[in-house]
Amino acid sequence: MTSLEMALEYIKINNVKFLRFQFVDIHGEPKNIAYPVKLGTADGEEELMGVLENGLFFDGSSIEGFVEIEDSDMVLKPDLSTLSVLPWRPSEKSVARIICDVYRKNGKPFEGDPRGCLKRVLAEFKEEFKGEYFVGPEPEFFILKNENGKWVPGDDAGYFELEPLDEGNDLRRNIVFALENLGFHVEASHHEVAPGQHEVDFKYDNAVKTADSVITFKTTIKTLAKQSGVLATFMPKPFFGMNGSGMHCNQSIWLDGKPSFYDENNAHQLSDICLSYIGGILEHTKALVSVTNPTVNSYKRLVPGYEAPVNIAWANSNRTSIIRVPAARGKGTRVEFRAPDPACNPYLAFTVMLAAGLDGVRRKLIAPEPVEKNIFAMSEAEKREANIDSVPSNLYDAIEELRQDKVLKKALGDHIFNKFIEIKTKEYDAYRTAVTDWEFNKYVRI
């Protein structure tokens, strides 16, 4: 969908009655304004063409991370290429959504728009390097059922299990059909390691399209789960003693229209650019995780054990390091950053990952030697000797690392950087001062 006329025709053919103008807040939570389509009225088509071309005004003061009430008039400008009918809504009176960029009333892009932030960094990358950034995420999630008023895993199945143990198979299949109707190229779906845990993989794309897809992916899964009487959660660690949900991010950069990570004559068949990119990610990891793992709960997943990616090192096939380079070479050469979880804002996560990697490329950092042994089995002394550090153990420490990171601050921009730190510091303080059931049960008899 690249023109107003094509968008209008799509809306007519699909009998769209409501059009959701969608955007995200600083957390990556989708928001929308539903516009009623009135093509049967005298002015309906003209009004629709007007909002598709010029956007919708809205009050941004109640959107977390946006603006104050005294300067709250903002505009949602739709990206026509994202217009899609929602397959879970009735077809006779269809609902469609269109993803928007956020602008100020003076016509300038809003510096606090996460999607706009990613687009700005990508534009700078393209201008400097003639570069493109591709990402292929692997978001995991849990399907929960309600038992006696308590949410519990939807089944007792394990990795790659089949029916009848995999009780989420039918729902997962319906999710795949819905995603395909929304334009996804779904590559695989399966039950994950933990009870009630699932994964649906879709093909990589450029960073903006992929970030859009992550938001659509989560909305689709949560909606279909609710319609099935269960709960889908992308919480990183919903249950103690079980694996958490990650969102491994496979990524590559192309320069001058060509993949840049492969060099058949270099060590590990990885180019100097790829090794420098890895070096940049490793150098900024402690600050990166504040954005890629942005909740208090994220750090309950990032603990030793449960295959958690806590070790700041890289490897080829070794999944005990935070960066892995999968076996594919040639055009398929990519870097997998294993820390992120699906609670992140994908626009901001992709922004800081690219910024960190490109910092390594610009400075021609040399990645350390890959660690091909099981880091989980290494003692603390062995890890120190090998210069293998760990990610921050909590959100507060990660935020403190972000405060000091000038590269990530520049990438995010002052508005998002300051708002993000302010919001996340308050979130951690609320957690720090809360009295948990564990504490009460542990200490009530003192």
UniProtKB/Swiss-Prot annotation:
Residues that, per the record, bind Mg(2+) 1: 138, 248, 336
Main location: cytoplasm
Compartment list: Cytoplasm
Domain GS beta-grasp intervals: 14-107
GO cellular component, one term: membrane
Keyword Ligase: yes
The protein's Enzyme Commission number: 6.3.1.2
Catalytic activity annotation: L-glutamate + NH4(+) + ATP = L-glutamine + ADP + phosphate + H(+)
Quaternary structure and interacting proteins, as annotated: Oligomer of 12 subunits arranged in the form of two hexagons.
Official protein name in the record: Glutamine synthetase
Organism: Methanococcus voltae
